[in-house]
Design a protein with these regions (language model features):
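Conserved phosphate-binding/catalytic loops in two-lobed NTP-binding clefts
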Residues: 77-90, 265, 319-350
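Gly/charged contiguous loops adjacent to phosphate- or pyrophosphate-bearing nucleotide/cofactor binding elements
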Residues: 2-23, 46, 150, 154-323, ...
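Acidic low-complexity intrinsically disordered segments
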Residues: 80, 201, 212-286, 362-510
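Hydrophobic, small-residue-rich alpha-helical packing segments that form membrane-like cores
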Residues: 37-44, 53, 60-62, 70-122, ...
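Gly/Thr-rich phosphate-binding beta-strand-loop-beta motif of the actin/hexokinase/Hsp70
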Residues: 1-2, 100-141, 468-491
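Short glycine-rich, Thr/Ser-proximal phosphate-binding strand/loop in the N-terminal lobe
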Residues: 133-161, 496-510
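Short beta-alpha connecting loops at secondary-structure transitions
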Residues: 139-150, 172-180, 260, 329-339
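Conserved phosphate-binding catalytic cores of ATP/NTP-utilizing and phosphoryl-transfer enzymes
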Residues: 84-116, 281-284, 290-294, 345-364
Length: 510
């Protein structure tokens, strides 16, 4: 998917204007800027939002390309003093701020905090460890989940489908034929969301009424009504999206059709608990092993919930009990839920707390990049029919590379063509924690290193002939904003400090 192309909203009629994801982001940000300037700044240019230090939150699972695009949208909206923060970290910062100094009584050295953030469209997981370093308690983000497009919207769609089938069955019993149009289905999905929140909330409601407008001209008489029960919602949402599984469960994948509609890479398996099990197993060695036997999964001792979906006590209890079952399999105690979080406002409040922590007013979570990043180097071999040239993954940024640091990539000479666009293949790994900058990886296990969007380079000739191959080395750095920057440095520069920024392409692989 080209995230600069006009693909939103997906599935919209032809007469609806479409915009790109990047444009959608900066339009939202522009609206927030205008609202701030109207309500807070009130015409004072010094108080304008574009004059402030802004912390913008993103999913922890955002790769380098997605972070680059987010930054681009923010700059387009006029936000220049910008820092990116992962949303699960923001939720934890909010919890720290709410607890004050008392947080040290609930999280101590050796604790492992699993942040489970399930919102409307995504499920985002992070693991933060409390580590004793020289007598000082340090917080480190040690693991991040995949980018999972799975959340409350999926649950609303399922519940709306169930309710639609009930309406059709009830109409047939009354001798009528019912077929909902596109707009009625959208309305039904909104109504289903309200019923879901009511029946999964703290209340004791046993059922909820759902009503949408009919197609007729009668406003009241044309209304379609039915009822959904607490048991139906629990079966659909709790058991469907949060099933009780063992720690060996993994998200199911299916073979994709030869022809697939272009769009977002939605999760194929709706079971959030399976995605959680996969995360904890994949990062089992993220921390030093306690004892002789290596653990089968990363063992959280604390759980922090965030996101609108997790406001439901039924869902929180299901996730916590499932994790406790996995820990019991490992022979360790269950995890304790950290209470006191505001699941609606935690990310915003945590972003503000992080901004203060950057100024020395609070503890900071260490972590750096959530992945190691690599460029693909194609081997120079004779062409053979049916045989692809071997690819070596050259590490350009190690796992955990901190903000404000940089490194020269020692991987031999790389030749790039000047005066025309060229591409580097780009890879990432959330599990290879020990690869240093310049490491050349010739073989790797399935799912250990994944291919990301390619790196797209357009180097101006700068006094060279168009099409020349210029020997370069790469220099990587993590900016203070929180994005990965790659630069190509010519071995024989035409001018002092000559270097080119290597842009991260926005074209993902389907």
């Amino acid at each position: 998917v080209d995230r600069r192309s006009a693909i939103l909203p997906p599935g919209a009629p032809e007469d609806v204007e479409r915009i790109s994801p990047v444009e959608a982001s900066w339009r939202y940000l522009e609206h927030l800027i205008e609202a701030w300037d109207h309500v807070v700044a009130k015409g004072d240019p010094e108080l304008a939002l574009t004059k402030q230090s802004v912390v913008l939150t993103v999913p922890a699972s955002f790769d380098a390309s997605a972070r680059e695009l987010t930054t681009e949208a923010a700059y387009a909206a006029g936000l220049e003093d910008l820092t990116l923060l992962e949303e699960p970290q923001a939720a934890f910062y909010a919890w720290l701020a709410a607890k004050g100094d008392a947080w040290r009584k609930e999280v101590t050295a050796g604790d492992v905090v699993l942040v489970v953030d399930v919102g409307g469209g995504t499920s985002d997981f992070s693991v933060i460890a409390a580590v004793d370093k020289g007598g000082e308690l340090v917080l480190e983000r040690v693991a991040v989940g995949d980018h999972i497009l799975l959340g409350g919207d999926n649950m609303d769609m399922l519940l709306a489908h169930i309710v639609e089938q009930k309406m059709i069955a009830e109409a047939e019993e009354a001798g009528r034929t019912l077929e909902l149009d596109r707009w009625q289905r959208i309305s039904l999905q909104h109504a289903a969301r309200g019923a879901k929140e009511k029946l999964l909330g703290d209340g004791k409601a046993k059922s909820a009424q759902i009503a949408i407008a009919g197609k007729g001209s009668k406003l009241v008489g044309g209304t379609l009504r039915t009822e959904v029960t607490r048991e139906e919602v629990q079966q659909a949402i709790v058991d469907g999206f949060f099933p009780v599984v063992d720690s060996a469960a993994r998200p199911a994948t299916r073979a994709r059709a030869a022809l697939t509609q272009l769009g977002l890479p939605y999760a194929q398996d709706p079971a959030v608990t399976k995605h959680l099990a996969a995360l904890l197993a994949r990062h089992a060695d993220a921390l030093p092993a306690q004892g002789k036997k290596s653990p089968k999964l990363l063992r959280p001792t604390r759980i922090l919930f965030n996101g609108g979906v997790m406001k439901s006590p039924l869902l929180r209890d299901r996730v916590a009990s499932c994790i406790d079952g996995w820990l019991a399999e490992e022979g360790v105690e269950g995890a304790r839920v950290l209470e006191g979080a505001d699941l609606d406002l935690a990310v915003a409040r945590g972003a503000a707390a992080y901004g203060l922590a950057r100024r020395g007013r609070g503890i900071r979570i260490r972590g750096g990049t959530a992945r190691a990043y690599y460029v693909g180097i194609e081997g120079a071999v004779p062409a053979v029919p049916g045989m692809e040239p071997p690819i070596t993954a050259l590490c350009v940024a190690p796992f955990g590379m901190e903000e404000g640091t940089s490194a020269d990539v020692a991987g031999g000479e790389l030749g790039v063509v000047v005066g025309e666009p060229v591409h580097f293949r780009f890879f990432g790994s959330s599990v290879r924690r020990k690869d240093p900058v310049g490491a050349a990886i010739e073989r790797w296990k399935k799912d250990e290193i994944e291919e990301l969007a390619p790196i797209e380079v357009d180097l101006p000739a700068e006094g060279r002939t168009k099409g020349d191959v210029v020997p370069v080395t790469l220099r990587s750095s993590v900016t203070e904003v929180g994005t990965l920057l790659l630069e190509a440095v010519p071995l024989q520069p035409k001018k002092k400090d000559e270097r080119w920024k290597v842009e991260l392409s926005v074209r993902g692989h389907d």
